[in-house]
């Protein structure tokens, strides 16, 4: 199929596709019931017609119905309507894909466990294919991936890979010293992933087991592996990962971000060189594609260039890209053959595939950041974010399939004798039991919406277009409330689809008062104000503190007419925050309707707040 209509793959804001969903769900349930009935039909039924007429049976059935009625009532009363086409402007939540929901519902009836092939033959194969989808999305020809519970687990696994691989040369020096003779400890700690994998390829299976036993999994030499460098915009899961992996929070170094909230590459190089001068190695660097609070895209290409430059000087680091939020957006740049389209051809490419309905800008720096992900050693990607599939579905992909043999807990030669395809996941991942229904959901989503411009590119293009238009809408917005003019200041041009903004009383130069106003707006526009089902505008918020962000917000502070001194006094700013994931707002009719509606809702809330 050339280009898809994304309105056909969601249940719909007003359940417009509800009849299709119900028809397909009933069809699939009927097929499952028939599958049960047709399994050795001559077997005696375990539940007889007489059983179904007994008082205890009937009472139990009625009690079950009552409990499920309560579940329905509690979910309807206590859930946030983020399916809305234009009322919800908050967290990374939106409509989920109808095919993914149906596949999850259907596969759940079999309750497959993807940790073992014997309990999930169908869905284990699906997960293997999803892992290959991830590798193809990032143009990693030798890559391998799998689904994880979430991005935090995937990040933890990325650090696990980095720690284990970095420790292998020291383990080789201990148990097979002849393999690394004449190499200093510094040289061993600065070997590339490819050099380490090439070294281990010559080992026998027994030698490899010895080396792994002496690696970081033994607890030895972990503090020798060096620092873990993250941007100030890091996700909080990295602190937990450093703790759990035994690397320690003291080994984490936060690299400053620029005014555009991307990692400062000059600061990164300076930090690495200062550490190298002290003979402190770099365990790894994290780049973020789609930061949690701002949606920004770090310059992965410049980090790769820096790594190549430093490699010539005998300094090397593992690179993990945390693309939990932004990873799926790489589909936007891939043609149907999976090729990354040149930047010079991008405008024509988007026009050919009708990606955008209005003028949308994709910065060259953002484009290059996405392009360079293919050079990372591992990448986090979350289907339950921009993949629009149900929770819980994170994911990770590694650049070289052989990397997994470094972290495996069962010798691959044992599994390969008894397990052909797909691979026995349990040997290579952090998790144990895992839902096969998740694999079915992600696999189905990837087949209905290919990971290129004709599929996910259409969906994510709609999201990016809506974000840029929403920011333009906010820029032009102002209100007159009780004789005061309320201005709206969007943060920055979004690299992706996140928009942050601040409400401010005109001529107010008191940052504390501005923060209070925006805290109150959040309280009035979220679950903090109680039941949100009747809310006409729902949003989220965040706080940029000097402790976390340094002085990167100063430019924004000054744009609002405040002084640097005011920032230094308060050292934090509260912003309203929206991940624009709704798939419908690239439609002019819908965009115009909802922007008018939420402007009215904003004005009403401001009238309630402003004294």
Curated annotation (Swiss-Prot):
Pathway: Amino-acid metabolism. Pfam families: Pyridoxal_deC (PF00282), tyr_de_CO2_C (PF21391). The keyword Protease does not apply. Keywords: Coiled coil, Decarboxylase, Lyase, Pyridoxal phosphate. It catalyses: L-tyrosine + H(+) = tyramine + CO2; L-dopa + H(+) = dopamine + CO2. Levodopa decarboxylation is not inhibited by carbidopa, benserazide, and methyldopa, that are three human L-dopa decarboxylase inhibitors. It is an enzyme of class 4 (lyase). Its EC number is 4.1.1.25, 4.1.1.-. Its cofactor is pyridoxal 5'-phosphate. InterPro entries: GrpII_AminoAcid_Decarb, PyrdxlP-dep_de-COase, PyrdxlP-dep_Trfase, PyrdxlP-dep_Trfase_major, Pyridoxal-P_BS, TyrDC_C, Tyrosine_deCO2ase_bac. One of its GO terms (biological process) is L-dopa metabolic process. It comes from the Bacteria. The keyword Coiled coil applies. Pyridoxal 5'-phosphate binds at residues 151-152, 292, 382-384, 433. The modification N6-(pyridoxal phosphate)lysine is found at residue 385. The active site is at residue 413. One of its GO terms (molecular function) is L-dopa decarboxylase activity. Belongs to the group II decarboxylase family. Tyrosine decarboxylase subfamily. Homodimer. Catalyzes the decarboxylation of L-tyrosine to produce tyramine. Plays a role in acid resistance since tyramine production via tyrosine decarboxylation appears to provide a cytosolic pH maintenance mechanism that helps the bacterium cope with acid stress such as that encountered in gastrointestinal tract (GIT) environments. Therefore, may contribute to the colonization of the human GIT by E.faecium. PANTHER family: PTHR42735, PYRIDOXAL PHOSPHATE-DEPENDENT DECARBOXYLASE FAMILY PROTEIN. This is L-tyrosine decarboxylase. The gene is tdc.
């Amino acid at each position: 199929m050339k280009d898809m209509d994304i309105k056909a793959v969601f249940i719909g804001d007003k359940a417009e596709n509800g009849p299709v969903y119900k028809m397909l769900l009933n069809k699939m349930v009927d097929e499952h019931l028939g599958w049960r009935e047709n399994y050795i039909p001559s077997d005696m039924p375990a539940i007889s017609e007489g059983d179904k007429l007994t008082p205890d049976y009937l009472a139990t059935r009625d009690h079950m119905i009552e409990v499920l009625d309560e579940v329905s009532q509690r979910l309807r009363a206590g859930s946030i309507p983020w399916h809305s086409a234009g009322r919800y402007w908050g967290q990374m939540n939106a409509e989920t894909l109808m095919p993914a929901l149906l596949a999850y519902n259907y596969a759940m009836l079999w309750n497959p466990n993807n940790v073992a092939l014997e309990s999930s033959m169908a869905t284990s194969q699906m997960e293997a294919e999803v892992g290959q989808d991830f590798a193809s999305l990032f143009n990693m020809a030798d890559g391998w991936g799998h689904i994880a519970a979430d991005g935090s687990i995937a990040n933890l696994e990325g650090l696990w890979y980095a720690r284990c691989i970095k420790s292998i040369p020291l383990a080789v020096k201990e148990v097979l010293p002849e393999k690394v003779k004449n190499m200093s400890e510094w040289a061993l700690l600065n070997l590339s992933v490819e050099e380490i994998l090439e070294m281990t390829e010559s080992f026998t299976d027994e030698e490899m087991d010895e080396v792994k036993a002496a690696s970081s999994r033994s607890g030895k030499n972990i503090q020798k592996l060096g620092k873990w460098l993250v941007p100030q915009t890091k996700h909080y899961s990295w602190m937990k990962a450093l703790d759990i992996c035994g690397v320690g929070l003291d080994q984490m170094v936060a690299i400053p971000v620029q005014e555009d909230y991307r990692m400062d590459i000059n600061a990164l190089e300076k930090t690495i060189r200062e550490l190298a001068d002290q003979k402190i190695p770099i365990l790894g660097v994290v780049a973020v594609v789609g930061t949690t609070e701002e949606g920004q895209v770090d310059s992965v290409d410049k980090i790769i260039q820096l790594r190549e430059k430093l490699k010539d000087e005998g300094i090397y680091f593992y690179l993990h890209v945390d693309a939990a939020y932004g990873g799926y957006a790489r589909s936007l740049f891939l043609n149907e053959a999976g090729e990354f389209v040149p930047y010079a051809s991008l405008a024509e490419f988007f026009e050919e595939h009708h990606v955008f309905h209005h003028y949308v800008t994709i910065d060259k720096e953002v484009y290059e950041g996405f392009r360079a992900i293919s050079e990372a050693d591992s990448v986090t990607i979350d289907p339950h974010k921009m993949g629009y599939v149900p929770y819980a579905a994170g994911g990770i992909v590694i650049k070289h399939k052989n990397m997994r043999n470094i972290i495996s807990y069962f010798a691959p030669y044992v599994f390969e004798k008894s397990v052909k395809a797909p691979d026995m996941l349990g040997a290579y991942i952090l998790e144990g039991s895992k839902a096969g229904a998740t694999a079915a959901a992600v696999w189905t989503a990837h087949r209905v919406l290919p990971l290129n411009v004709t599929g996910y590119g259409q969906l994510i293009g709609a999201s990016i277009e809506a974000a840029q238009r929403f920011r333009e809408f906010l820029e032009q917005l102002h209100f007159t409330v009780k004789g005061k003019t309320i201005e709206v200041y969007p943060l920055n041009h979004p690299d992706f689809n996140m928009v942050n903004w601040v409400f401010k009383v005109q001529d107010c130069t008191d940052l504390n008062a501005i923060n209070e106003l925006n805290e109150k707006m959040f309280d009035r526009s979220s679950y903090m104000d109680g039941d949100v089902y009747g809310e006409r505008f729902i949003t989220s918020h965040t706080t940029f503190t000097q402790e976390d962000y340094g002085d990167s917000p100063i430019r924004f502070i000054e744009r609002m007419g405040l002084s640097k001194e005011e920032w230094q006094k308060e050292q934090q700013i509260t912003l309203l925050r929206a991940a624009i994931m709704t798939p419908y707002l690239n439609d002019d009719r819908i965009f115009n309707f909802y922007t008018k509606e939420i402007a009215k809702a904003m004005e009403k809330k401001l009238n309630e707040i402003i004294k």
